[in-house]
Amino acid sequence: MIAKTVAILALAGSAAAYAPTMSLSANRRELVQGAAAAAVVAPMLRPTGASAKDAQLRAPVVTIFDARGCKDHANKEYTDPKAGNAENDECCVKVQMTPIKVADDAAALVLKECLSELKGKK
């Protein structure tokens, strides 16, 4: 959006800088042309809202698996070479984007509590 705005302003600026003018006074035709150009550029200069919201309301969930000292069975899942350090070989971290679901009644309760705390601080 910013690049588009800069390009339009640069184009308008270069057109204004090299416009052939016979006199310094602006006539009616030039005023109408300037107003038309401003009307075209004005909608492009409006601020736009952020579009970064995740539609599924997902958040990263970190799960830590720690099997240090576990002697119940031999691990057969991992077949690559081991790190050589027993502590690192028996630990795993999993990060997964998971949809977060919040019930409407829970959200209303949190909102009510926050508003009551804000009103109490006056």
From Swiss-Prot:
What are the TM regions of this chain, as residue ranges?
A: none
Binding site residues for (2R,3E)-phycocyanobilin 2: R68
This protein's membrane topology, according to the annotation, is: Peripheral membrane protein
The record's Gene Ontology cellular component field reads:
chloroplast thylakoid membrane; phycobilisome
Instruction: List positions binding (2R,3E)-phycocyanobilin 1.
Output: D54
Q: Name one Pfam family in it.
A: Phycoerythr_ab
Q: How does it assemble?
A: Heterotetramer of 2 different alpha chains and 2 identical beta chains which form 2 alpha-beta heterodimers within the heterotetramer.
What role does it play?
Light-harvesting photosynthetic tetrapyrrole chromophore-protein from the phycobiliprotein complex.
Name of the featured protein: Phycocyanin PC645 alpha-2 subunit
Q: Which species does the entry assign this protein to? A: Chroomonas sp. (strain CCMP270)
| Higher taxonomy | Eukaryota, Cryptophyceae, Pyrenomonadales, Chroomonadaceae, Chroomonas
